[in-house]
Amino acid sequence: MAEAHQAVAFQFTVTPDGVDFRLSREALRHIYLSGINSWKKRLIRIKNGILRGVYPGSPTSWLVVVMATVGSNYCKVDISMGLVHCIQRCLPTRYGSYGTPQTETLLSMVIFSTGVWATGIFLFRQTLKLLLSYHGWMFEMHSKTSHATKIWAICVRLLSSRRPMLYSFQTSLPKLPVPSVPATIHRYLDSVRPLLDDEAYFRMESLAKEFQDKIAPRLQKYLVLKSWWATNYVSDWWEEYVYLRGRSPIMVNSNYYAMDFVLIKNTSQQAARLGNTVHAMIMYRRKLDREEIKPVMALGMVPMCSYQMERMFNTTRIPGKETDLLQHLSESRHVAVYHKGRFFKVWLYEGSCLLKPRDLEMQFQRILDDTSPPQPGEEKLAALTAGGRVEWAEARQKFFSSGKNKMSLDTIERAAFFVALDEDSHCYNPDDEASLSLYGKSLLHGNCYNRWFDKSFTLISCKNGQLGLNTEHSWADAPIIGHLWEFVLATDTFHLGYTETGHCVGEPNTKLPPPQRMQWDIPEQCQTAIENSYQVAKALADDVELYCFQFLPFGKGLIKKCRTSPDAFVQIALQLAHFRDKGKFCLTYEASMTRMFREGRTETVRSCTSESTAFVRAMMTGSHKKQDLQDLFRKASEKHQNMYRLAMTGAGIDRHLFCLYIVSKYLGVRSPFLDEVLSEPWSLSTSQIPQFQICMFDPKQYPNHLGAGGGFGPVADHGYGVSYMIAGENTMFFHVSSKLSSSETNALRFGNHIRQALLDIADLFKISKTDS
C-alpha cells in the first residue's frame, strides 16, 4: 500500500550537500485540481445564490420587464408615470455624461425596470410567506375542504409554480411562532392528567399556576425578543444544549441507524456494492451543492425547510471539554475507510472527474485484499469516539494535536464521510427472527471501535454486501439522512446496476494509485485512554437489548379502513402494549417535525392522553361492547392527530418549556415547575420513520424494494425506545430497544405485546389482511 508521505506535497532534508527537496507530483496535482474544483463550486454557489435570491423571479423575467419598459417608451407610452425622467435627472454627472440622451434614457429605463422587478419579487415572497403561515388546511378533513383553503391552495401553487431550487423557499418560510404561556401550561397539564393521581395533579397544577403568574411573563419577554432576532428561537439552543453539550457517550445514547433493503439482494460482492453506493452518495452531494434536489413538499405544494441538508457531508463533531463543535467543510475529495483495524484514505476523484463505480470497487477491493497488520494502538482507536466526550477531548488535545497523528486525524475528520468495511455478514432471514435484531445491533454500535461515531454518518458495509448507516444526531434529524438513503438505494438498484457476476458495470482504471494507509504514532498512555473508552463503550453496548421484527398481518392499507391515520393507530397500540407490559401508563415521546418553519427541527407529541388511556382501560376490562370500544378508539385517534398537527404548526409543549428553562438559567431564576418538567423521564420514546420522500420508483410495482427503517437506543434506564416504519400497504417494521440491566423492561416481551395490540385493535373493526 502507498505510504503516508504520498499525501504530502513536499518534503525536505538538510544534508552536508545542502537542502534536498522532494516533490510529490501526485499531491501537487491533487492540490491544483482541488483549487480548480473549489473555484468552480464558488462560481456555482454565486450563480445559485443569485437565482435563489430572485426566486420566484428569474433573469428572463427581468429581461421581459426591461423590454416592456423600453418598448412602451418607443410607443410613446410612459408606463413609469414620469419616474424614468426623474431617474434620468438624478443620474450623477460628476464624472461626465453617459453619452447621448438616448443612452441616459435607456439606462434610466433599465434602473426603473430593475426596481419594478425587484419590488415585484419582494411582494411575491412576502405574499408567499403570509400564505405559508396559514395552517388551517392541516385541521380540515380531505373530503371537507373549506373555500378559504381551496383559494389558499390555488394562490400557493401560482406563487411557487416555477421550478424551485433546493433553498428557493428558505426566505419565504415563516418563523416558528412562540406560543403563549397560558396555552402551553394548559396543554401540559392536560398531557400529565392521565399519569398523576388527584393529589399529584393538584400539586403540579399549583406549581404551574405559580410559574405562569410570577416567573413566566419575564422569561417569555426574553424569548419573544429572541424570536424577533433569531431565525428560529429553538434550533440553536436545541443543537447546543441537547446534543453538543452532552458529556455522555454519543454511541447508543444519541446516534441512530438505518437499514438497507432487506427483502432483495443486489449483489453479494462487498466491494462492488460499496462502489455503487459511494458513487451514488457523491452524485447526491453534487446535486446538493448545485441545489438541484427538489425541496420536500407537503401535499406537493407546501415546502419544508431544507436547512439541515447543508451539513450532510464533510461534517464532523469535534469533542470539547465543555461542549462539542460541529466542523463543516465546503469540500472534501476523499473518504476515510476502516478495515481490520487499519485506516485508509480513498480518493473519490481522478483529476476533476468523479471515479466510476467500477474504479471505486477496485479501490475497496485493494483494501480488502491488503494483509498488513494494524499499527500499535490503531485497531481500537475509534473507541475514543464511542466513550465519554471529556476523555476524548483530553486525548485529542494531548495526543493528536501535532505530527502524523494530527495529519491522520485530519484525514478522517475532513473526509466526506466514513466507511466501515465489516468482516461479519448480516441479512434479514424471515425464518430466523433474530437475524434482523443482530443486524440492527451491528449498525447501532458494531464492536465499539469499527465506527467513527463523530462523523455526520458512517456507511457500514457487511461482508455479504448488505449495507447500513450509523448517523450522528446533532447536525440533522432522521428524515434528512433518510432522503439521502432513499436516493442512494434507488440509484444503486435502478440506475447503476451490476453485471451478471455481481460486479459494478464497466472496466476499472488499473493505473489509479492505491488507497493510502494512515500513519499513527500512538504512545502507551494514549493506548490506555483508548482501552478505557472501549471498556465504557462496551459496557454500554452490551447493556442494549434490541428486538427488530417485521409485522406481516397488515399495513397501511388495512389501517385506512379503520378511518384513522396509520400513525395514530400505531401510537394507540403502543399505549395498549405498554400497559400490558408494565401495568401502568407512562410519559410518552413521539417525535414530530416543525420543518414548515424556517430552520425548524422537531417537536414532541405527548402520545399518552386521557383519551388513549380511557380506550386502553376499556380494552383491559373486556366488558365493553365493540361499538363502545370503537368510539373510544376514534376519540383517542382524533386527539392524537390534533396534537400532532398542533406540534407541527408550532403549538407544541416541550420546545417552548425547554426554551423558557434555558432563559431562566441565563437569568439565574429558579423555577420548581420547570425543574420538575425538564427532569421527567421519557419511559417510552417513539418515532415513525419516513419513507418515499423521493419518487424514484413505483413501490406498487416493486413491493419488495423496502428498507426496514432504522432505530435508536433506549432513552431512559427503565424505558423503551421504539421506532417503526409503516413500510407499505401490507407490512410494518418495528425496532424496540431497552436495557438488559433493567428489571422492568424486556424488548422481546414488549415487541410481542406490540404485535398483539395491533391485532386486537384491528379485530375491533372486523378487518383482516384479505380485506386490504
Curated annotation (Swiss-Prot):
Active site residues of this protein: H473 (proton acceptor)
Coiled coil region boundaries: none
GO biological process, one term: response to blue light
Keywords annotated in UniProt: Acyltransferase, Fatty acid metabolism, Lipid metabolism, Membrane, Mitochondrion, Mitochondrion outer membrane, Transferase, Transmembrane, Transmembrane helix, Transport
Cytoplasmic topology ranges: 1-47, 123-772
Enzyme Commission code: 2.3.1.21
Function: Catalyzes the transfer of the acyl group of long-chain fatty acid-CoA conjugates onto carnitine, an essential step for the mitochondrial uptake of long-chain fatty acids and their subsequent beta-oxidation in the mitochondrion.
Protein name per its UniProtKB record: Carnitine O-palmitoyltransferase 1, muscle isoform
Species annotation: Rattus norvegicus (Rat)
Gene name of this polypeptide: Cpt1b
